[in-house]
Amino acid sequence: YKEVPGIQFTIMSTYNFLSMTSYIPFLKDVLDIKLEYHRWDDHRTPMLLDIPYLRFPNHQAIFIMEPEQLQMIYDQVTFMYQNLEYKNWYGSANRGFFEHEADKLKRIYNIAKDNVVTEVTENNRRNFVKFVDEHDKRRGTNFLATFPEYGEVYYKWKNM
């Protein structure tokens, strides 16, 4: 924004199973940028956050999550609402998340909250394990070293 005054851009962050555990740090980074570059006296919005959710492939969508993981999404939505801009006051207008941005993550929370685990879910969980195992094999990577926070569900699903 300093080098190209007046630039406006949108971050499109497709929410998926693997983004769940790191979304608060991501939101903090976005908030820092918003606080630095958004100004109350400027009608332009240098940066917007769009949060669609991944639907396909099914084995990477949030619908494979364990019920206790829903709390992560709840905490992320809460973080966004706690850091909303307040448009009716000079010092806080255009600074922070916009309500429509937080509403997008809230929608994801509500969809996930109403999700029912079925045999299709179980199959997608098994496919997730197959996917990361095959990815590690082909690319020489280590899923559990990269995402140690998923170790418990990985082993649970691997042994289904």
PLM features: residue spans?
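Conserved C-terminal portion of the radical SAM core fold
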Residues: 1-155
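Sequence context surrounding c-type heme c attachment/ligation sites in exported
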Residues: 160
